[in-house]
């Protein structure tokens, strides 16, 4: 028997139902990804499965005594108290007893008065009476699993840690089905990696919503697509789903075209003259009416957003130049002796944990903050369009239309006037939705509105700080295409690994203590180079001391002059170094070309491997030359 079975589900809040005779079956020990466009009803379906929202029609059957728990889409806001209290509230009926026990236990440690000891005894008696010691142990186990300190104040936690606390609250009830709504939102890449590992050890079923394609690929054992009120199951991985979904849409398009052709023929027949009416078949008339009704009820596939950047005139060749830049806040080093050059057309991602200084570096580059030391030079003719991750630019009380156009009826798009409603439809805002206050929008809709505003501004430098949060996959892919075709310079911050892979030619990785590594390629290319670089440094550190000692001992034992073969090798090394430098420079020029990463993945990986080998060969040749020179001078 399924853990959850939903039959003939119907739910509507407007003209178009969110669920239209939908069916769903959830089995034990599977990880189901629920996909669909923004506004399709995925979060509402999660609430239904968690018994928070009822159906207009249909029924849901749960396995007896099934425990379901849900992690909400946004991390908790404006919460106070300890982590322990917050997590304990996941067991709602017994939470007060457990919270009081935790509180009085700590109080007794600092003030073991008779009053406090008597209170502790009473609370312990209540725990005994209700059999709550097992729940106390479970809370402590969950806190330990998540690396959470019981006495940490919620108000002092970052978004990522609040997310962990919320996950602990969802887990503590011992659910057999765990519902996760956008679990990677507000998490950095390291936290996402941790979450993937943790969830794979979960003993139960996970149903999750995510637009992070890497996360879906790593987690999902089955895809359920919510499309126009129907739930369609696709067994297997995410890439298989994409292929099958595309084929299903192609077949649907052909079937609709054939249906429309037949309907048009019947409409011609019914409108023919007296001769046709004499032989009119009443059954055929009834069939035509049924076809008309079916056509009127058809829900078309939701269109894709149409984004276009208003590009300004070209900037100067050098966009930014930084030399030995340092910046600290309250004693914490965020940028340490950083030097870099950004040229026109570069597309660079800033990668690192939350709070490491990515947004700070962008503000330093734009002159919004002053560096402690070092030099930052901004290029000429820069026209900046800045996408803010905190969404502070939108007025929640004004409508979508007014937030975009300040009460005007037209906006300028590529130098031509365009009606606001028409422009907003390119970003999937129906005219009715354009009249809605911003406070009523979903996260994805707010993001689309910010992008609509951003792309009206002429620019040759795009600064995108977390642009992918809450965007559905189709809009994400369109944004990727837009960035790929953008002729200006792009600097972006994102924790979406595939988005970074698909958009940038260089990554700046924050490696701790203000150090920033610069690597060519997308996210996975950069991580590979970073790992290789660290391994080489460790190998060099290990080899430096040992050969030095060995060489010193050899020199003491054998002060004789160099052999003929070593002399010949030393004489040939300068030419060898020139050849290696030339080969390395040629590879660097090839990789730096803007079109390099548009070529096949296997080819780019081969060239990057050759680049790494060339760097290593040059370094080894220099070390060999220095060693032979030291032998020569000591001979």
PLM segments and residue spans:
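ABC ATP-binding cassette signature C-motif
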Residues: 1-257, 311-635
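Intracellular alpha-helical coupling/juxtamembrane segments of multi-pass membrane proteins
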Residues: 244-277, 281-287, 291-298
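A short, polar/charged loop/turn motif at coil->beta-strand junctions and beta-hairpin connectors
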Residues: 264, 299-303, 314-316
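Long, charged, glycine-rich C-terminal linkers/tails
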Residues: 301-309, 437
